[in-house]
Amino acid sequence: MNYKIKGIITAVGDIKTTKLGTAVQQLHFEQETGRMFYPSALGTKIELLQDMLPGDVAELEFHICGSKGMYNNVIIDTIVRV
């Protein structure tokens, strides 16, 4: 199931690599309600974050992954600056 929310990017993390070799980059995202949200981009989805800067307003589409421990289980599918 995919979810879509709108909010403000407050920080873009560094690219890291999991023990299995997957590239991961985390985003700090403040929803319109004021709640903080910390989704992760995996693998080639990291390219979606290259143009994003703190303060940008964006629409984020994501899904929840059952795998926990290696990375945040909220996975970015698409992100578009609005």
Mark where each language-model region is.
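Single-stranded nucleic acid-binding surfaces, predominantly the OB-fold ssDNA-binding core
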Residues: 1-82
